[in-house]
Swiss-Prot record:
GO terms for cellular component: cytoplasm. NAD(+) binds at V18, E39, K46, Y71, G85, A86, S107, A124, A125, N126, S149. This is L-lactate dehydrogenase. It catalyses: (S)-lactate + NAD(+) = pyruvate + NADH + H(+). PANTHER family: L-2-HYDROXYCARBOXYLATE DEHYDROGENASE (NAD(P)(+)) (PTHR43128), L-LACTATE DEHYDROGENASE (PTHR43128:SF16). Catalyzes the conversion of lactate to pyruvate. The keyword Oxidoreductase applies. The active site is at H181 (proton acceptor). HAMAP family: Lactate_dehydrog. GO terms for molecular function: L-lactate dehydrogenase activity. The keyword Calcium does not apply. The gene is ldh. InterPro entries: L-lactate/malate_DH, L-lactate_DH, L-lactate_DH_AS, Lactate/malate_DH_C, Lactate/malate_DH_N, Lactate_DH/Glyco_Ohase_4_C, NAD(P)-bd_dom_sf.
Amino acid sequence: MTATKQHKKVILVGDGAVGSSYAFALVNQGIAQELGIIEIPQLFEKAVGDALDLSHALAFTSPKKIYAAKYEDCADADLVVITAGAPQKPGETRLDLVGKNLAINKSIVTQVIESGFNGIFLVAANPVDILTYATWKFSGFPAEKVIGSGTSLDTARFRQALAEKLDVDARSVHAYIMGEHGDSEFAVWSHANVAGVNLENYLQDVQNFNGEELIDLFEGVRDAAYTIINKKGATFYGIAVALARITKAILDDENAILPLSVFQDGQYGFNEVFIGQPAIVGAHGIVRPVNIPLNDAEKQKMQASAKELKAIIDEAFSKEEFAAAARN
């Protein structure tokens, strides 16, 4: 960890449900000293209104400069957070959003780079693993300075679901979801533990709990977004707090280990793809990935997830408007 400057600046691109919830989380938690909110021209006044509304909470939290921003404001930002994109509708998978959101992502990243920005990108728009890869390609940045929210929310859901079943605090449950933030994600059961006790051993002392319940629990975690979208139209609170946690780790140079969408350089037998795994993150971005030794079944799931993402990337970047970036 290194000494960090006192004034931390975040630019948020996208003031929809996720973006505005993230901004609210930053204000509530006293994260960053400056927050600029960028929206498309026809929604600029909404960003102005949200900035004003959020500023009225500052007397209860901590000082912060909050305003509706423009892309030139990215020049001296420490972090640009991208939540903008077409929302996932009922019946859609995250991967269905690829075509719509790649073009949006290219426009955003191009304008951020033109400002002279040299900080860190944090991507949350879906499909997040694909769009993190796209941000890396469109920006030309080193891979360690481009981070996706990855399986951070999935992991939080997993820990909370286990905690509820076991009647313990979720913060005492240590377990990860890895792979795609989506349908091919998987639970790393082999290393799940409660306060250091292997989950399998811990369950021996828990009555009326069987293996089938674990399968149902994981499926509930994997499909949680669909459940929420069908009931209320979108998910935003959980991912907003996950983004706030990642933001704090970066701005405070914590060297925290978080499950993120990070660049693969042979860690699990594949390259040139961003996918969810634990990684050390601090002021300069990804310090290094943390490679959990997966069992054979988990390795197969990780490789299948990566293969699916790679196929989608190759198809998407074969299109003329994105092909030049793919060759860089």
